[in-house]
UniProtKB/Swiss-Prot annotation:
Its cofactor is FMN. GO terms for molecular function: glycerol-3-phosphate dehydrogenase (quinone) activity. Keywords: Flavoprotein, FMN, Oxidoreductase. It holds the Pfam family FAD_binding_2. It comes from the Bacteria. This is Anaerobic glycerol-3-phosphate dehydrogenase subunit B. Belongs to the anaerobic G-3-P dehydrogenase subunit B family. Its EC number is 1.1.5.3. The keyword Oxidoreductase applies. The gene is glpB.
Amino acid sequence: MKFDVIIIGGGLAGLACGIRLAEQGKYCAIVSSGQNALHFSSGSLDLLAKLPDGQAVSQPLSALSALAELAPEHPYSKMRNITQLDELVQEAEALLRRCGLDIVGSSAENHLRLTPLGSCRPTWLSLADIPVAPLNGPLPWQRVAVIGIEGFLDFQPQMVASALQDQGIDATADYLHLPALDRLRDNPSEFRAVNIARILDLPENRQPLADELSRLSSTAEMILLPACIGLDKSAPLDALRAVVGKPIQLLPTLPPSLLGMRLHQALRHRFQQLGGLVMPGDAVLRAELVDNRITGLYSRNHGDIPLRAAQMVLASGSFFSNGLVATFDKIYEPILDLDILSLPHRADWSHSNLFAPQPYLQFGVNTDNHLRPLRGGVALENLHAIGAVLGGYDPLQQGCGAGVSLTSAVFVAEQIISEMAVTL
């Protein structure tokens, strides 16, 4: 099976890279082993919230020079040696909008998103259904009704309301009861956001839901709900807003995250619409190399039939997605045994303080400035690495996980397009 480009991994980075390549007419295949981290996403995407020294960042693009001094191995720092990162960021934003996603935010300045705990976190882009506020301004609401769903344990309205009250907002907490959910509620293991959304999205349940929300929010100017409506798109929520006559925003729940799934579905639909091929439930097990080039990939489902392409992209994720594997005494990349940025002594991999930055989160594949992975200190000619498999950054402490995924995806796609044009 022959393609122009094969991408290993179907998460945010892999899909974004595939979309950009397919938009330029490249025939791409994505080998995806299963659920990716987007299913755990809040629906907001971070670009850069903190520098490695802990300094807060309000304008991400203005902080890149300081980041390069503090973290020269950071993917942003490497990409800045080759191109303008602001151009990659702008293209990433445009790519998401071409996928039909309604997003708010800008790289010029971070904004605040409301978390399921009622606190605020800085971020870059958010789905339009998520409650957001200016970075340095007051929260834009005075009276808020936080409404959970009776029997739904993955969202606690009292916790959100209490945190909002601490910020000077008149917030109330209540639970709605909808008879349409009673049968689902009888099985707690099935009473999850996705299954609830399938019921709440039905047109026949809209008016009863609107009546219940109106009853519980009579004095509120805005309603906060758990993200349990609008499974595929926001149209059911828009229709509910029209009936209730008030703004209704969604807060993420425990996984699986409906907002993250909506992101994934939009990206995957765009990729397939452009002619890309997704191989779900498959995994690349090994690679065939001649000199310093990959000539074939062998996957679990295709056995001895090699997958061939002129260019390969490694977007296999970090430990969560098995793109990196940890044994008792080492970290390794399982397909090609690529060079890894890590620490030699296991005792140094983590800190006893759970809330301190954890060193292992910065472990990942080592690359050159073109994001070509190193193997024995030498860059492979036709392989690039993108997203969470890369080393040199802490996506949690620095608040840059989605930004690295999207910018590295666009960066590598543009390099591949240029290289293939020269080859032709």
